[in-house]
């Protein structure tokens, strides 16, 4: 299995392309995560629009450079809103990310909507181990939005899900794994305090969408997003508390320089991380 990091040239190239092109990224996410998601996109140079104002799902689902749908958007939007955006994206060829938050946690009507979205062929599916095991048809029950399984235990499931859905599938944890059903890439690093920042995992879906907008290989885009996220978290690791870490994390995302030399600044210490 190949590992990638901030020092992988393709990762830096992916971020440079976002900074150069400022892709328009449309998102449907929950109100808890919307602010951080928008700030993450702005920090890397993307142009976000988030929410379900009149006509946005159909118009922006088709017209944005990329779309991401976090299914916890159902907290404030109806299922038709999410399905409209996904259908518009699929029809227009807009690449999109599905984040099936809390799938398998014991809400059958909610889970059915997620599966309806899956049928619309997302480009990338990202989530924690419990969510993705459940989406692949396995038995896994998360603790609300949090995982009770390790990413390693999900590897066989995400490979199968990728092959059946045609999507790249990414599971997050202390080490992230991203697969297209044939090749699997590993991304280590980050900081455990991402698990204490509301919406950190949701915002990762937004970042994946920004990199997908560049139209390169989806596997490379999704894995690069994880590596960029991990690096910013590592560089924020000396923040004193959780709130200062959250602010510093966005700062570090904005300061990442694709042209920097590996000698200019260490990519940080490898550590445990992330809202899984």
From Swiss-Prot:
EC assignment: 2.7.1.50
Recorded metabolic or biological pathway in which this protein acts: Cofactor biosynthesis; thiamine diphosphate biosynthesis; 4-methyl-5-(2-phosphoethyl)-thiazole from 5-(2-hydroxyethyl)-4-methylthiazole: step 1/1
The protein's enzyme class: transferase
Annotated keywords: ATP-binding, Kinase, Magnesium, Metal-binding, Nucleotide-binding, Thiamine biosynthesis, Transferase
Residues noted as binding substrate in the record, renumbered to the chain: 199
SUPFAM superfamilies the UniProt entry points to: Ribokinase-like
GO biological process: thiamine biosynthetic process; thiamine diphosphate biosynthetic process
GO molecular function, one term: ATP binding
Binding locations of ATP: 126, 172
Catalytic activity: 5-(2-hydroxyethyl)-4-methylthiazole + ATP = 4-methyl-5-(2-phosphooxyethyl)-thiazole + ADP + H(+)
Known cofactor(s): Mg(2+)
Function: Catalyzes the phosphorylation of the hydroxyl group of 4-methyl-5-beta-hydroxyethylthiazole (THZ).
HAMAP family (alphabetical): Thz_kinase
Similarity annotation: Belongs to the Thz kinase family.
UniProt name for this protein: Hydroxyethylthiazole kinase
Organism: Burkholderia pseudomallei (strain K96243)
High-level lineage: Bacteria, Pseudomonadati, Pseudomonadota, Betaproteobacteria, Burkholderiales
Name of the gene this protein is made from: thiM
């Amino acid at each position: 299995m190949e590992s990638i990091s901030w020092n992988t040239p393709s990762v830096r190239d992916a971020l440079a392309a976002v900074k150069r092109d400022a892709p328009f990224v449309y998102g449907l996410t929950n109100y808890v995560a919307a602010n951080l998601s928008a700030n993450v996109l702005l920090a890397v140079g993307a142009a976000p629009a988030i929410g379900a104002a009149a006509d946005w799902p159909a118009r922006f689902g088709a017209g944005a450079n990329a779309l991401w749908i976090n299914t916890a958007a159902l907290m404030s939007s109806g299922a038709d809103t999410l399905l409209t955006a996904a259908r518009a994206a699929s029809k227009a060829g807009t690449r999109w990310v599905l984040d099936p938050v809390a799938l398998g946690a014991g809400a059958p009507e909610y889970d059915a909507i997620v599966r309806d979205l899956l049928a619309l062929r997302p480009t990338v599916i990202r989530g924690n181990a419990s969510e993705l095991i459940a989406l692949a048809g396995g038995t896994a029950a998360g603790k609300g939005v949090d995982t009770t399984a390790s990413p390693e235990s999900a590897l066989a499931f995400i490979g199968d899900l990728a092959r059946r859905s045609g999507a790249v599938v990414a599971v997050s944890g202390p080490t992230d794994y991203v697969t297209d059903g044939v090749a699997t890439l590993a991304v280590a690093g980050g900081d455990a305090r991402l698990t204490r920042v509301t919406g950190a995992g949701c915002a990762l879906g937004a970042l994946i969408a920004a990199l997908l907008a560049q139209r390169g290989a989806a596997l490379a885009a999704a894995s690069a997003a994880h590596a960029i996220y991990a690096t910013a978290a590592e560089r924020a690791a000396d923040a004193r508390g959780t709130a200062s870490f959250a602010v510093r994390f966005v700062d570090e995302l904005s300061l990442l320089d694709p042209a920097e030399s590996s000698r200019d600044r260490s990519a940080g210490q490898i550590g445990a991380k992330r809202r899984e």
